[in-house]
Amino acid sequence: MATQRKSKSKYVPALGFDWLTPFYDAVVGITLRERTFKEALIRQAHLEPLQRVLDLASGTGTLAIWIKQGEPAAVVTGVDGDPVVISIAKDKASAANALVQFDCAMSDALPYPAAHFDRVVSSLFFHHLSWHSKVRTADELFRILKPGAELHVADWGLATNLVMRGLFFFIQLLDGFENTQDNVSGKLITLFEQAGFADVSQRQTFHTVFGTMSLYCGRKPG
């Protein structure tokens, strides 16, 4: 996930500053149990052949590439607002021989028709957005998903204990207190329900060195 550079939506780059973007993969891999929680997110999504899958705020492409490698017959698209990370993602996909389309667009104005995708997945993105931008983004995801399709999100959530809450303070210093407070207050479930999703729930949590990582899911009725 990365910065939406030309949007009225205002949020923070992946590691707080653009110059840190080249180090994103290494930092996430070392500190956040990336493979563990992303593989859990992929399993949670129950992907099937020929499904259209969107990785929202795909960043450097890791999740989208793993999805394609795990389900080669799926049609996988990644979208991000930062052309720099889109370029990195394309190079990574090419090196991995993974056929993934990467588009540059804003999360609250996605360039896809209504009822187009079977799954939307997203990792470590929503905590970068203001509440207003979270709402606009959730509405967009509801629009582009088919009836009966599903949303699966991995992001910071309500801390499971005081230690996890204390560790999350460092994320708030880096990414902003206003943007991240919705996550640590447990408001993502409310966000997705207000957008129209049904059966919204937190499915799993993971302890990391920076706090509690939560996996969410929701379904578009129909």
Where are these predicted regions, by residue range?
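C-terminal lobe and adjacent flexible extensions of AdoMet/dcAdoMet transferase-like proteins
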Residues: 215-222
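Conserved class I S-adenosyl-L-methionine
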Residues: 2-46, 62-66
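Class I SAM-dependent methyltransferase SAM/SAH-binding core
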Residues: 54-56, 60-109
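C-terminal alpha-helical "lid/dimerization" subdomain adjacent to the S-adenosyl-L-methionine
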Residues: 8-11, 152-195, 200-214
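Short glycine-centered segments of the SAM/dcSAM-binding site in methyltransferase folds
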Residues: 52, 148-150
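A short glycine-rich, Lys/Arg-flanked "PGG" loop and its adjoining helix->strand segment in the class I
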Residues: 135-147
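A short SAM/SAH-binding and catalytic strip from SAM-dependent methyltransferases
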Residues: 119-132
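A short acidic, Gly/Pro-enriched loop at the edge of an enzyme's catalytic core
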Residues: 108-120
